[in-house]
Each structure stands twice: as C-alpha cells, then as structure tokens.
Amino acid sequence: MRHTDRFVKKVVIERIGDQRVLAEEEDVVIKEERISLYLNGTKLMSMMSLPSDQDAHAVGFLMSEGVIEKIEDLKSVQISSDGSSVYVEALINHENITNLFKEKTLTSGCCVGVTGNLEGNVLRKFIATPMQISLERIWEGMEEFEMSSHLFHETGCVHKASLLLEDGSKITAEDIGRHNAIDKVMGKARLGRIDTEKAVLVVSGRLSMEMVVKAVMHNIPMIVSRAAATFLGIKTAQELGVTLVGFARGEKMNIYTHSGRVDLRACKRKRGVTLHAPNQSSSLLR
C-alpha cells in the first residue's frame, strides 16, 4: 500500500470523447474529510482538508490568523485517534479570535479558504530580511516542486506548498486547498522550531493577497509560483516587503516586487526573467 492510498478513492466514470462515451472505467479521486479544530476546550471550526498533518494545519492556521502569536505560546496539540479532530491548548490573542468570526472574507480559494484577519494582523509588519537567492536555486526548486507532486499527478486535485530553507533542505505539504497547504507547511516549520526568515515559499496556486498575508504572518520574505499574481497580491507584497515571483516555468519567471532578493549576477540563463516592479514602487501599482 502506498502512503498516498489513504487520501484517494476509486470511482467508476464514463469517459467522454468525440461527443460520445468512449469507455466506462475506474478513476482515482481525492478523498477529503471534515476536520474539527478545538482551541482551549472549545470547538472553533471545521475545515475540509486532506486527513494529513492535522496538527501542523491547526497550528499554521492559528498563527496565520494571529490567534497564536508565537510558537512559545503553544502548550499542546493532539490529534484524535480517528484523525477527525485536533485539540490545541495555547495562550491566545482574544481580539484576533473575535475578529476571526466577526467579519469573514471569502477568499479566492473557492470557499475552501475563509479568513477573518486578512488585513488587521499585518498593518504593523514589514519584511526587511536582506536575503538573496540565485535564479539557479529558484529554477532547481521549481523543478523539484513539480516532480514530487505525486497526488497532483495522480488526481489533478491538490495544491502544494514547499519551504526552501537556507541550508538547502525543504518542507512540503499538500491539500485540496492552497490556503490549507500553506498553513500545513508553515505549521510544520513552527512545530519543528525552524527559522523561516530566509526561506522561500513555493506554491502551486495564484499569488493573491491572502497568500502574501500568510507569508508575512510567518516572516517569509519571498513567494514563488508557476501561476500568475493578482493586482492586490502585487500591491500587498510591495507594501509589506515581500518578493513576489510568478510564472516560474522552465527558465522563465516574472519578478513583480522587491527584486533585489534575486541574485542575477552569476546566472547564465537569465534571458527569461522579467522585472515588473523592481525594488521601488512602479507605475503598475499606481
């Protein structure tokens, strides 16, 4: 049995082509589950996600929302025996937990991602980390990222997030929602007490505002995706000091904001790099 088998189910489908049924056959689909999150003995919410890394998902989500402000405030996290519930005990920011339910923003994640603290948590933050990464390392990271997405290649139905760490290692998570995947990979880093201030977040989905906000809440200075960036994603990244890189495919990429963190000097393949908004604000954001 493969480790991914517990996340999938086989169903019978009718495959259509040339305006007719070509065959009736088995297909493999993702099996999501409802995961209940309990905080300090009270049920906070239920989330639809893959039944994996539930503890990391809970911690990453609560820290992304500012409910848990630092990992030292986490007392314990436990997963129920059937994997359907996560129990977190922690010192919490009561104002942020109130805001989480007072005004929700339905994000661009097709109802999988809902957040209540998109803007308030990051008003006092700015990522000023003076790190640099070579184009070669970004391209290598993207190649590894694409090659290792086993569940996506099998089902076409998951998002993935990876953290490329300063020492060359990486942390990876997958889920049906791109917000969930980011929360999981961030939670893994926090539970492992891993420094992410010079890490690069690689994601499979578009670079929207809420993706940038999640990165800022975990002090991530750079986000890279093979997908596009949205206007608010670019604007938020520019204002908060995040380097945003989109359309990173093959030997090409678009750098939208704070390009100084990408080292172009030693690269022999930089012909495919487009700088949309170098270190200063550009007309794109006005």
Swiss-Prot record:
Its main location: cytoplasm. Mo-bis(molybdopterin guanine dinucleotide) binds at residues 247-252. GO terms for biological process: Mo-molybdopterin cofactor biosynthetic process. It is found in: Cytoplasm. GO terms for molecular function: sulfur carrier activity; sulfurtransferase activity. It comes from the Bacteria. Required for formate dehydrogenase (FDH) activity. Acts as a sulfur carrier protein that transfers sulfur from IscS to the molybdenum cofactor prior to its insertion into FDH. This is Sulfur carrier protein FdhD. The lineage of its organism: Bacteria, Pseudomonadati, Campylobacterota, Epsilonproteobacteria, Campylobacterales. The gene is fdhD.
